[in-house]
Amino acid sequence: MVEKIWFENHPLKYLLWPLLWPLSVLFGAISRSKRQQFQTGRKQAYQAPVPVVVVGNITAGGNGKTPVVVWLVEQLQHLGYKPGVVSRGYGAKAPQYPLVLNDDTPTQHCGDEPKLIHRRTGAPVAVDPVRANAVKALVELDVDIIITDDGLQHYALERDVELVIVDGNRRFGNECLIPLGPLREGVERLQEVDFIITNGGLAHQGEISMSLAPSKAINLKTKQQVDVSELKALVAFAGIGHPPRFFNTLESMHADVKVTKGFADHQDFDQKELEALALQGANVIMTEKDAVKCSDYAQDNWWYLPVSAQLEPKDAERILNRIKEVKATYGSPSA
């Protein structure tokens, strides 16, 4: 129902307006106050010894940030840099912080997105609610560029480049602040960022167009790869910010989907529930982010669908050149 109020102009929005509007005003006041404390110097933000690139958004929910983080890490690695990624680790609780991931780190400790990023890129990834501490842990590993997965509103960490990801189809919904709308900050905040990347839909003037390109489905147990259209009677589920995006992708690939099930973003799955869900079809298909959470008990007919961010070469060059410019000001040998 929240999604309908935020993005579909549901009539319930007007019924709840007297209750939610004051809360949105309060949310905005608190948000602005927190930022102003760092802007005016009343609170001191941490300045990392290496460039910090934020990949975030101004709306709640998933817009495609993680594929952009993966893309950016891979691009920087190709250029000879040593990027590392910091994250809050939403939905997880580590025994201690900062937590630097390894191949055996359970998602319950680090979160699904950090685990996915580490697995896809091999880059160092650190999780800490205090992102500055995660940055310090990565700097000790000789990382020379920091990328923050989310964290646009985490003003306790200074940043050099800001990339904001926008859902090109849903945009900013009713353009109201949380809880009446999906906005973490007002749309005017976009005037201050370096790049606005639009995921799907039609990019507006000044925005960079991006698409998510799916590849072959990968079996969780055997790593076999097949075209998703070859899998019959699929049960599709997704625990991401906007599950219908995944289901629409499957439809566009002519997948034989019989059942769909959406879960909350970062939800910790119940094994028995997924196993019962799997009985409704011949194969199970999920997102890569979901796969990192249930690989330990995956069955032979469970598959996931990786996606990769695709940008026009000229737009990719603009982003990378901006990061190179910033990197040069730090005077590192790898600049």
Curated annotation (Swiss-Prot):
Catalytic activity, reaction form: a lipid A disaccharide + ATP = a lipid IVA + ADP + H(+)
Keyword rRNA-binding: no
GO CC annotations, alphabetized: plasma membrane
Example GO BP: lipid A biosynthetic process
First and last residue of the signal peptide: none
Molecular functions per Gene Ontology: ATP binding; tetraacyldisaccharide 4'-kinase activity
Annotated pathway: Glycolipid biosynthesis; lipid IV(A) biosynthesis; lipid IV(A) from (3R)-3-hydroxytetradecanoyl-[acyl-carrier-protein] and UDP-N-acetyl-alpha-D-glucosamine: step 6/6
EC number: 2.7.1.130
Any one Pfam family match given in the protein's UniProt record, by short name: LpxK
Superkingdom of origin: Bacteria
UniProtKB keywords: ATP-binding, Kinase, Lipid A biosynthesis, Lipid biosynthesis, Lipid metabolism, Nucleotide-binding, Transferase
Annotated ATP binding sites: T59, A60, G61, G62, N63, G64, K65, T66
Known role: Transfers the gamma-phosphate of ATP to the 4'-position of a tetraacyldisaccharide 1-phosphate intermediate (termed DS-1-P) to form tetraacyldisaccharide 1,4'-bis-phosphate (lipid IVA).
HAMAP family recorded: LpxK
Family: Belongs to the LpxK family.
PANTHER family in alphabetical order: TETRAACYLDISACCHARIDE 4'-KINASE, TETRAACYLDISACCHARIDE 4'-KINASE, MITOCHONDRIAL-RELATED
Protein name as annotated: Tetraacyldisaccharide 4'-kinase
Organism: Vibrio parahaemolyticus serotype O3:K6 (strain RIMD 2210633)
